Regions:
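Vicinal oxygen chelate
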Residues: 1-4, 8, 29-30, 80-114
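Mid-chain, well-packed structural core segment of small domains
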Residues: 61-88
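Conserved short beta-strand elements that form part of the metal-binding/catalytic scaffold
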Residues: 26-61, 103-104, 108-114
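Short hydrophobic/aromatic beta-strand element in the GNAT-like acyltransferase core
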Residues: 40, 66, 98-101
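Short alpha-helical
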Residues: 14-15, 73-74, 97
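Conserved active-site tyrosine of GNAT-family acetyltransferases
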Residues: 16-21, 79, 106
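N-terminal beta-strand motif that seeds the catalytic metal site of vicinal oxygen chelate
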Residues: 1-17, 63-65
Length: 114
């Protein structure tokens, strides 16, 4: 199981990026519209870290892991069969791939197919 994308939603994306750059030695780029204007950095293992502010008033700060999967539809079906509640079904994001979010035991988990 590999984390493809680590999403950090916070109130001050610039401050969060600066802290992550200082502590972890990564470098964040400009906001990416397809990813909710998240600023993206690539970790040493090739996984992506995205930092953005909430997209809606109801959205709260959160850190969400998106696990890489080969088949997003199958992974969503398996998550649901395991008792997960699908929050967002498979959704295409520009050229970045397909993602989905499900809840399990109060935790939000993401799936990502490149």
């Amino acid at each position: 199981m590999r984390i493809h994308y680590l999403e950090i939603v916070c109130s001050d994306a610039d401050a969060q990026c600066a802290a992550l750059e200082q502590v972890h030695g990564v470098s964040f780029g400009s906001p990416v519209a397809d990813l909710g204007n998240a600023r993206i950095a690539e970790a040493s293992d090739g996984s992506l870290i995205g930092v953005r502010v909430p997209l809606a008033e109801h959205e709260q700060p959160i850190v969400r892991n998106y696990y890489e999967v080969d088949d997003i539809v199958k992974a969503v079906e398996e998550a649901e069969a395991a008792g997960g509640v699908i929050a967002f079904g498979p959704t295409r994001i520009g050229d970045t791939g397909n993602w989905a979010i499900y809840f399990f035991d109060g935790i939000q988990l993401g799936l990502w197919q490149r």
